[in-house]
């Protein structure tokens, strides 16, 4: 237990250092840019009203030395003070208010997509492993390979054109409407988001299960006369947990990248959409906040994965 606690503390310290490094790099990359976010806000009024220009710079703290801006930003992070939006349509709004709208939407999209991917990918991977080299195995693996390798930015417009425009089965955009309309809006983005993940899970689970089924303890269990269902679900299934945990990192990366693509194609007001909008409008405080938020989420999930590894496999703690 002491080894586990020491391992967890070391990983926690590493997590904090990584988040601090990401925060620092993101801050200085945006602040050292030659672009002045205040000038586009005033436009032609800048020449006739320079006082407003300096007032806005003071409001956003841009008139302070860079080191003081950095320390002020770090001091505000524990209080969720992420600065104020510099984009004209949301000028002066706290960045955290914008994130409070986008985070639940992205979490909902990601959770439903992940659940659907698990419900499809794991059973397909299981059947493929149990029916190795059969027609079912080859067919399912081919389909999973296709949906895994085709990127969402290719699938999304094709699905919108065919399913939404030509067949008119589902809406091509929107999110959050009440009742049946809201459910119909969710179907296409969730299915497209889950498709690649399902293929990834199916291929990974099949590979892990086939490897475990070759182990000596599986042969011993079968030699003892245990039912095949018990061997598969109890002995083999339990031992696929560790290798399955190894794909959490790639899964998180896929979720982050997929959210950017799917949310923008379907007009979903999540973190991905907010980030892309901030980049196109050069809204640096929002870019900083979303970058730090997404990076922290990925690093934290990897931290939990490391702790899980150490919990189920004591050799990792050494």
Question: Which residues are covered by each model-predicted region?
Answer:
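Small-residue-rich alpha-helical segments with characteristic i,i+4
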Residues: 18, 131-152
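Membrane-water interface segments at the C-terminal ends of transmembrane alpha-helices
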Residues: 25-32, 61, 73-75, 142-171, ...
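An internal, D/E-rich "acidic patch" concept
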Residues: 1-4, 62-122
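Juxtamembrane/transmembrane-helix interface segments of polytopic membrane transporters
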Residues: 22, 26-30, 156, 160-164, ...
């Amino acid at each position: 237990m002491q080894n586990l606690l020491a391992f967890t503390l070391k990983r926690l310290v590493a997590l904090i250092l990584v988040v601090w490094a990401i925060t620092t790099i993101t801050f200085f990359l945006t602040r050292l840019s030659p672009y002045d976010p205040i000038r586009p806000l005033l436009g032609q009024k800048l020449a006739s009203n320079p006082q407003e220009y300096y007032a806005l710079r003071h409001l956003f703290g841009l008139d302070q030395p860079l080191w003081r801006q950095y320390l002020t930003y770090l001091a505000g992070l524990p209080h969720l003070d992420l600065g104020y939006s510099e984009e004209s349509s949301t000028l002066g709004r706290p960045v955290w208010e914008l994130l409070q709208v986008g985070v639940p939407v992205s979490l909902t999209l990601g959770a439903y997509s992940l659940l659907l991917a698990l419900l499809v990918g794991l059973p397909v991977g299981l059947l493929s492993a149990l029916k190795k080299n059969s027609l079912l195995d080859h067919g399912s693996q081919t389909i999973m390979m296709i949906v895994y390798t085709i990127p969402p930015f290719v699938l999304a417009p094709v699905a919108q054109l065919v399913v939404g425009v030509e067949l008119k089965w589902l809406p091509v955009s929107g999110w959050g409407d009440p009742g049946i309309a809201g459910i119909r809006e969710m179907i296409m983005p969730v299915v497209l988001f889950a498709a690649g993940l399902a293929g990834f899970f199916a291929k990974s689970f099949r590979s892990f299960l086939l490897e475990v089924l070759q182990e000596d303890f599986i042969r011993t269990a079968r030699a003892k006369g245990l039912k095949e269902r018990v061997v598969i679900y109890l002995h083999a299934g339990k031992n696929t947990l560790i290798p399955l945990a190894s794909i959490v990192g790639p899964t998180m990366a896929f979720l982050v990248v997929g959210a950017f693509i799917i949310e923008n194609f379907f007009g979903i007001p999540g973190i991905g959409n907010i980030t892309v909008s901030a980049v196109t409008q050069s809204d640096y405080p929002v870019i900083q906040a979303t970058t730090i938020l997404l990076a922290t989420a990925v690093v934290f999930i990897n931290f939990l994965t490391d702790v899980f590894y150490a919990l189920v496999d004591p050799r990792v703690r050494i």
